[in-house]
């Protein structure tokens, strides 16, 4: 899922003379004050101050992904020979799990463990009421190889892989899929894409009968959200940058249709570059914190990564035919913190909007956060479009720190709201792709997380079946 990119860097005066002459600390402090500014761009931010509190906070078990018993973990029986990782359920407009002719439906990325380029969306289904990992049936690939050409879409024709997204059960009983069209032909170009998936039921079987209305929705405008052309123009993979435009999550609010997605900021709302290191809005905390942290960052080995870090959870409005209606400001950004905030997920619960994202410590620029740290971060607002404030004061919702070679390693945590109560079901995948001959990437055991206002906590002793979606 991780792609490299680069963009133009803002030019900022260096302090070579001051460093050679001594007094480096004073020179940095003076320069920081001269260059400092505060610009929020009208959006919420994942701040350095909040993130720096997380290494201590994550020691609390209420934020820790449960430990799982390796001996109980099974491969998905109906996915023989396949690794299965990122997954998402067919959901109703309010985010609860839909029932399709008596079944729960899950879409997931799957492919051969021996071929990293083999990444396609498969459809799995399970009778409502059955929770066993062995009860999941596999309807196969959603798209035929020819579908990207049959769509007569200039972007789709260059697709080489299918990446994560979401699916909604429409008011007229249709399955509408949203996913990421990835092209290895164009420096990792990613585009938000949709199709109607036609499914029929026969006896105890769901069958995919092809797709229709298969089309590209959005591939970045450059101004609000970075596009791949900017990445290409300014150095592509050689920069250490990370271009993202993926993981579209469908949501409705007050009769309007939206996609929330992973992205990077564009040129008009907080672009990457050295000057971003002087924006107080990205730091949080007070003046003293900004002065100390910005000076430290300027001299850090992570300075370059921080300059390039401009992750965003973006939002666009859709027309009723699922074409682009309006490009909107990001819901939240992670400038100077990380370039990658994945698996966008948002829903309304008890009158509040909850926004979640997954991220890796290895992509972050925060002292105390390690490369093995895996996070789900969360934010809350009174409206879909924000402003968003961090849950649990910092945004920490879940942390997992296992070695990637551990069979019980999990990632791509996804919160599934329930029809009743204050608990959500957390799903994930378990075991990294291609790491073991006999242990495939599979649905991880689900578990419960409680949400109450601006606080969350993992529910003790709440481990469920692998891939379980509901408890009501």
Swiss-Prot record:
Coiled coil: none annotated. Its EC number is 2.4.1.10. Its main location: secreted. The keyword Protease does not apply. Residues 1-29 form the signal peptide. Induction: Induced by sucrose when expressed in B.subtilis. The record marks 247 as: Transition state stabilizer. Sucrose binds at residues 85-86, 164, 246-247, 340, 360. Ca(2+) binds at residues 241, 272, 308, 310, 339. Keywords: Calcium, Carbohydrate metabolism, Glycosyltransferase, Metal-binding, Secreted, Signal, Transferase. It catalyses: [6)-beta-D-fructofuranosyl-(2->](n) alpha-D-glucopyranoside + sucrose = [6)-beta-D-fructofuranosyl-(2->](n+1) alpha-D-glucopyranoside + D-glucose. It is found in: Secreted. One of its GO terms (molecular function) is levansucrase activity. The active site is at residues 86, 342. InterPro entries: Glyco_hydro_68 (IPR003469), Glyco_hydro_beta-prop_sf (IPR023296). Belongs to the glycosyl hydrolase 68 family. Catalyzes the synthesis of levan, a fructose polymer, by transferring the fructosyl moiety from sucrose to a growing acceptor molecule. Also displays sucrose hydrolase activity. This is Levansucrase. It comes from Bacillus amyloliquefaciens (Bacillus velezensis). The lineage of its organism: Bacteria, Bacillati, Bacillota, Bacilli, Bacillales.
